[in-house]
Amino acid sequence: MTMNSCADNSTKTNEADAVLENIFNRKSVRSFTSEPVSEEHIETMLKAAMAAPTAVNYQPWRFVVVTDRAQLDAMAEVLPYAKMLRQAPLAIVVCGETTWFDGKENPYWQQDCSAATENLLLAAEALGLGAVWTGVYPNMELAGPLGEFLGLPETVQPLCAIPIGHHDGTTKPRDKWKPENVHYGKW
């Protein structure tokens, strides 16, 4: 084994440790300071979201970035489970194009946009920001009004709204490992 291969293995181990630490430290943060999120951080989170896997590389995700205080407050009225929007300086609404190239229904947009959402949440954690996934779709009592509020085209559905901001660090990650939920070979 050469010195370079040892260094390469060490680097890969350190990178793997950093990735896993970020995953295990991710938490749902519902309380934010008023400090704005930089445009650089917003772009980094969006780039991470768009790096998600996607069926046939269709990339159906669309994002609505909301930083206007009045609009965030109004969104909190539209989404009863997202009252923390009143504190958050930023929300990113993850939406999906529900049709394929040929106009037929895209049955994978929810999966693709969910993967993008998780990447966005992990990027927020890596940047030292707090965020929480607030579900919207498939509840049309939420998706319909939010889509109208945001002026979404007919073929675009809001999957979730992600309030994002700086936090005080009091929210701690939870250990969600439950071996009884794992089955090998068959149920």
Describe each model-derived feature in a short phrase.
Residues 1-187:
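Acidic, surface-exposed loops and disordered segments
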